[in-house]
């Protein structure tokens, strides 16, 4: 109170000394209609609006996240959540008062017209006589008539030789019961039935001379 009274006394003294010529300037500077006071009010208003917008955005994001998790929105903020399909459709068409038909078929004790049947309490399936029979698709034949009447020759069949068990990759098996061993000598190999002969192996130098000749 002392500071305010001191300012008022100073203003009155200035008015008396200056013959009330500066009264308008002093009143505009110290009065409630000054430019600094108005700018402060606008700054507070802008900060308040920004805080409200941030709170609304945060609530919208939180409700959207809770809806994805299957939880209810925050109490009192359900109007911030996006509308459901049926709700948005009613708002678009303007048929809020008119009751729309449910997309889910009505549950009855017996099978509906388009149901194939139903299961009883014991788990046995009972077909519905009212359901229309749908024929299965026709079977696809492996060999059509076009391939039979075509002029293309089929691939040759693979025929195995009668003695395929005795020959394998050009290797012959001896007809006798005894198989030559590595430790057998030349004389023992010659005594074996079948006339087993030995093959002469030429050294590398002699093989080169034979190849040139």
UniProtKB/Swiss-Prot annotation:
Residues 63-213 are cytoplasmic. Interacts with PMT4 and WW domain of RSP5. GO terms for biological process: cell wall organization; chitin localization; protein localization to plasma membrane; vesicle-mediated transport. Keywords: Cell wall biogenesis/degradation, Endoplasmic reticulum, Membrane, Transmembrane, Transmembrane helix. The chain crosses the membrane at residues 40-62. It is found in: Endoplasmic reticulum membrane. Regulates chitin deposition in the cell wall. InterPro entries: Chitin_synth_reg_RCR. Residues 190-213 are annotated as: Disordered. One of its GO terms (cellular component) is endoplasmic reticulum membrane. The keyword Membrane applies. A motif (PY motif) lies at residues 104-107. Transmembrane domain is required, and the cytoplasmic region conserved between RCR1 and RCR2 is also essential, to endow resistance to Congo red. This is Protein RCR1. Changing residue 105 to A: Reduced interaction with WW domain of RSP5. No interaction with WW domain of RSP5; when in association with 82-QA-83. It is a single-pass type I membrane protein. It comes from the Eukaryota. GO terms for molecular function: protein-membrane adaptor activity. Residues 1-39 are lumenal. Residues 203-213 have a biased composition (Basic and acidic residues).
């Amino acid at each position: 109170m002392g500071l305010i009274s001191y300012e008022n006394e100073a203003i009155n003294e200035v008015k008396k000394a200056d013959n009330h010529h500066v009264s308008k300037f002093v009143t505009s500077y110290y009065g409630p209609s000054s430019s600094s006071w108005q700018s402060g009010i606008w700054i507070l208003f802008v900060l308040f609006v920004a805080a409200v917008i941030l709170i609304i955005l945060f609530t919208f994001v939180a409700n959207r996240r809770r809806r994805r998790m299957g939880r209810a929105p925050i109490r009192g903020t359900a109007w911030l959540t996006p509308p459901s399909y049926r709700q948005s459709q009613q708002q678009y068409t303007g048929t809020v008062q008119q009751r729309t038909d449910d997309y889910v078929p009505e549950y009855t004790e017996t099978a509906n017209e388009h149901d194939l049947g139903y299961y009883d309490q014991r788990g046995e399936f009972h077909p519905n006589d009212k359901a229309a029979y749908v024929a299965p698709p026709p079977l696809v034949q492996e060999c059509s008539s076009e391939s039979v009447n075509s002029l293309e020759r089929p691939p040759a069949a693979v025929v195995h030789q009668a003695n395929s068990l005795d020959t394998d990759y050009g290797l012959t098996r001896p007809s006798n019961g005894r198989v030559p061993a590595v430790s057998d000598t030349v004389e023992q190999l010659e005594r074996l039935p079948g006339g087993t002969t030995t093959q002469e192996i030429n050294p590398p130098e002699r093989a080169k001379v034979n190849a040139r000749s």
